[in-house]
Swiss-Prot record:
Disulfide bonds: none annotated. Gene3D superfamilies: ph1033 like domains. This is UPF0310 protein msl3206. Belongs to the UPF0310 family. It holds the Pfam family EVE. It comes from Mesorhizobium japonicum (strain LMG 29417 / CECT 9101 / MAFF 303099). HAMAP family: UPF0310 (MF_00771). InterPro entries: EVE_domain, PUA-like_sf, UPF0310. Signal peptide: none annotated.
Amino acid sequence: MSAYWIAVASAQHVRRGRNDGFMQVNHGKAAPLRRVKPGDGIVYYSPTTILGEKDGLQAFTAIGTVRYGKESPYQGEMGGGFTPFRRDVEWAVAEEAPIKPLLDRLDFTAGKSNWGYHLRFGLFEITDHDFRLIAEAMGAPKTLAEATA
């Protein structure tokens, strides 16, 4: 049985990971990534386009499935001695989708005035329903949600 996760990062950082086929969370920490397993569904939420800016992007910016082959997170090279922990991801072809139209339908936000609370953790588990709803909003292939079920 697969799990589903939302990771949080600026869109600029997400795009780099999407282009290179990996994910990293919480400034490269290993512990959160140990909860994520091959076959799990991943969605990235980006509050901003660029880290530190307040442009109000608030959108889902990538969706995919953790690749099989490496059972544990590994360290990647970013330069300057920074070696963050990562997991490889098969990113789906999808469009960015704003979160606001989904707030009343997502299990983790529905009926909550402080809907951004969970997003502060950087990585948290979501329901199958939420993953499918986000995938649909992003125009991701239907096989993505089916492949992780």
